[in-house]
Design a protein with these regions (language model features):
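N-terminal helix-loop segment corresponding to the beta1-alpha1 unit
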Residues: 1-164, 170
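Extracytoplasmic/periplasmic beta-strand context in beta-sandwich domains
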Residues: 21, 169-171, 184, 188
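Single conserved hydrophobic/aromatic residue that forms the stacking wall/gate
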Residues: 175-195
Length: 195
């Protein structure tokens, strides 16, 4: 999304590549999902299990205007790459963290997958009701898209704020919350009907 707005995005991938590179459907040996999600991005492979990889990632962060990471909350902290490491040395940095279930609470360390979050937030049931009782999972990653829109909006607001104040900031979003907010009218209806 940010590349569409003119950002120069460097995507960091593990040595084996982003797992969505290997998904279907494919056209000319390329995953259509990967291409759609990563069009316009430059890529670099970094082995974050090695100290040299972590330091390379730290140098990339120090040179960035905006960082977006989507690990579980404990991962960047464990690697020493969380916002607190860079807040003082990079005061203009905008650091966005995306997680499945937030930075605290009983589900914070759970991995989030769009089909699971679809079911947890009621989208699967709602779509099944509309389809006359066919509750097959929707193949579209609603949660990924909704969370990307929410995160991009937060980053744009933070960039605007930085222009006014000169200060960067930490922003975060959660896939579960983003997806739930996308259909609050359904949630409200269910609560009012007490289903």
């Amino acid at each position: 999304m940010l590349t569409d707005l003119g950002a120069d995005v460097i995507k960091v991938e593990p040595p084996a590549g982003d797992m969505t590179r290997f998904t279907y459907p494919r056209v000319n040996s390329q995953s259509t999902y990967f291409v759609q999600q990563n069009v316009g991005k430059r890529n670099i492979s970094i082995d974050m299990d090695k100290p040299a990889g972590v330091e390379l990632a730290a140098r990339l962060i120090e040179s960035a205007d905006v960082v977006v990471e989507n690990f579980r909350p404990d991962v960047m902290r464990r690697l020493g790459l969380d916002y607190s490491r860079f807040a003082e040395t990079c005061p203009r940095l905008i650091y966005a963290s995306i997680s499945g279930y937030g930075a605290s609470g009983p589900w914070t360390s759970r991995r989030a997958y769009a089909p699971v979050v679809n079911a947890e937030t009621g989208i699967t049931k709602h779509q099944g009701d509309v389809r006359g009782g066919s509750y097959a999972n929707d193949p579209h990653s609603h949660g990924d898209v909704y969370t990307a829109v929410e995160t991009a909006s937060a980053i744009l607001a933070a960039l605007y704020q930085r222009e006014r104040t000169g200060k960067g900031q930490y922003v975060r979003s959660e896939e579960h919350t983003s997806e739930l907010q996308s259909h609050l009218n359904l949630v409200c209806r269910l609560l009012l009907e007490k289903k």
